Swiss-Prot record:
Lineage of producing organism: Bacteria, Bacillati, Cyanobacteriota, Cyanophyceae, Synechococcales
Biased amino acid composition, Basic residues: 12-23
Pfam families: Ribosomal_L27A (PF00828)
A GO molecular function held by the record: rRNA binding
Keyword entries, A-Z: Ribonucleoprotein, Ribosomal protein, RNA-binding, rRNA-binding
GO BP annotations listed: translation
Keyword Manganese: no
Region (Disordered) location: 1-57
Entry's Gene Ontology cellular component terms: cytosolic large ribosomal subunit
Bias (Gly residues): 25-37
Protein name from the UniProt record: Large ribosomal subunit protein uL15
Gene that encodes it: rplO
Organism superkingdom: Bacteria
Amino acid sequence: MTLRLDSLKSNKGARRRKLRKGRGIAAGQGASCGFGMRGQKSRSGRPTRPGFEGGQMPLYRRVPKLKHFPLVNPKHFTVLNVSALNDLKDGSTVNLDSLVKDGIVTSPKHPLKMLGNGELTAKKLTVQAAAFTSSALTKIEAAGGTCDILH
C-alpha cells in the first residue's frame, strides 16, 4: 500500500467521538447535559465571561491602573562600583574584557556602567565604559585616572 494523503487514517483510539449533549438519557449526557440542576451555570447562554465574579466588582476593576508604560527596548548595563577597582594595579587600563579576565565581572553580555559607590584607592586608572555616573566620574578623576566613554 502506498502512502498518499487520501489514504491516511488515524490510529485506533487516537481520536475520541464528540459528546452530543441534550440528545436523550440513553446518550449519557441528556436532560441537564452534565451542567447540574439549577443555577446560572446550567442556563442557556452559558458560560459567563472570563473575569466575571457573580456581580461582585471583579479583580481587574478593583486593582488601580498603572501610571506608567514599560520601556519597549530598555538599556541593560553591567553595573560596577568604583570600590571594586581597588584590587587592580595602579596605572592599569580597565575595560569589560579585562574585568572578565580578572574575575570581577562574570559575563561580558551587557555594556559596562560605572557607579560611584565606595572609595577608590587605586591610582591613575584608565577606565573604559559605556556610561559613568557623575560621582564615579569625579572619584576616578580625583584619583588621577581618566574616563573614556565607549559607544
